[in-house]
Amino acid sequence: MTNEIRKDAETRMDKCVEAFKNQISKIRTGRASPSILDGIQVEYYGSATPLRQVANVVVEDSRTLAITVFDRTLGPAVEKAIMASDLGLNPSSAGTVIRVPLPPLTEERRKDLIKVVRGEAEQGRVSVRNVRRDANDKLKALLKDKAISEDEERRAQDDVQKLTDNFIKKVDTALAEKEAELMEF
C-alpha cells in the first residue's frame, strides 16, 4: 500500500518537473530554438492551428530560425501570427522560406526573463510539495484506518520526503541551466 502511494507520488512529481522544464523551454534565450515558436497559432481555414501543424521550423544558424510553410498561401498568415505574438520577432519572407532572426537580448530583458524563470521554478517546487502533502495525507488516512503501523507510516513519509528533495533538486538544476543560458552573450 505504501509502495503504491510512493510510486504515485513519484510519477506525479516527475510530471511536475517535466511541466516546469516544458514551460521554461518556451522562454526565449539568445539562441535560436524551434520551441520558441511552439505557442504560436496560425489562422488556417477559419480556425487557429499550431504553427507546427502547418509549417516546418528548423534552426538555420545560432540566431535564425527558418520556417518552411506546407501551403504557400499560408506564408503571410504565418508572418502575421509571429508578429502578433509577444516574442518581439520580425519575420522576413524569402520565397518559400520565412526567416526569423532573433535579436540579441538586452541586459534588462535578460534580468526580466530570469525573474520569470525563477517564478516558474517556484511554481514547480510548490507543485512538487503539493504532491508530497497529498501523499502524506493518504499515509495518515491509512494509519487512521489502522491499515499500516506508525513505523510504516514514518518510513513511508521519509521516503516521500527523499523523493521531494530529489525532484526539487531537479527543478533547481533546470533553473540554474536556464539562468546560465540566459546570461550567455
From Swiss-Prot:
Gene3D superfamilies, alphabetized: 3.30.1360.40, Ribosome-recycling factor
Main subcellular localisation: cytoplasm
GO MF, any single term: ribosomal large subunit binding
GO BP term, example: cytoplasmic translational termination
Top-level lineage group: Bacteria
Compartment(s): Cytoplasm
One GO CC term on file: cytosol
Cytoplasm in keyword set: yes
Keyword terms of this UniProt record: Cytoplasm, Protein biosynthesis
Keyword Protein biosynthesis in annotation: yes
PANTHER family named among the record's database cross-references: MITOCHONDRIAL RIBOSOME RECYCLING FACTOR PSEUDO 1, RIBOSOME RECYCLING FACTOR
Family membership: Belongs to the RRF family.
Role, per record: Responsible for the release of ribosomes from messenger RNA at the termination of protein biosynthesis. May increase the efficiency of translation by recycling ribosomes from one round of translation to another.
Name the UniProt record assigns to this protein: Ribosome-recycling factor
Lineage of the species this protein comes from: Bacteria, Pseudomonadati, Pseudomonadota, Gammaproteobacteria, Enterobacterales
The gene coding this protein: frr
